[in-house]
Amino acid sequence: PHIVCADLSRFLEDISETFIPLADSYKIAFTYSIAPDISIAYFDKNILEQVLYNLLSNAFKYTPDGGSVSFSASLEQSSSDAVMTLRITDSGIGIPPESLPYIFDRYYKGASIAFRRSESSGIGLAYTKELLELHKATIQCESELGKGSVFTVALPISEEAYPEEWLEYSEPKMEEVSLRESVPLEETNSVPENLRQTLLFVEDNEDLCRYCLLYTSDAADE
């Protein structure tokens, strides 16, 4: 992880606003709320952007036209650490009770469902959970079949929550985030150039491509 000190409120607002055109096109009521006490914080922009992109995209994917999706961010302050709570709520198809314990397992697709806007690889939520674990964060889901789901993320945002070697104190100018079809992973490969090898991976599923990139990059660093 590359933890920087940045304006978290603006970062969350920028990401939220990129989903407004998508909501309009599907006639889905989309709302977002960011608590006023969320401001400057410590977090990995790349990880958090990918997590929110995946969770919000899933919410829209499984919510029929005319439904609703909401995103909220609040702050919980303990004696030592500040933890941000993110909630993504949708009025979509929901998750069957028998599938709920397994939704963060790799390649788990669950039962066939009546509505979704695109096919799933079964790794999107597993990928999201593993990204969050890299960030010392947790994720959980509550869902009711036919009524929708709520995904809750608890993310530490204080300097003290992270090892010194993760912290980057020089913060470049924040760039405006944009909704895109693919969220590239930041390159972390530290293998010397003359020892690197090329792996050709042919796959048209974006989630699977991102997931394989994550693991091949990790393997190269070992």
Indicate residue ranges for each PLM-predicted region.
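Conserved small/polar residues in nucleotide/adenosyl-binding loops
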Residues: 215-221
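Short conserved segment of the HATPase_c
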Residues: 95-107
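Glycine-rich G1-box
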Residues: 21, 93-94
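Conserved micro-motifs of the catalytic ATP-binding
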Residues: 1, 40-43
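A conserved beta-strand-to-alpha-helix junction within the catalytic ATP-binding
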Residues: 2-17, 29-31, 49
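Glycine-rich ATP-lid/hinge loop adjacent to the conserved G-boxes
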Residues: 108-119
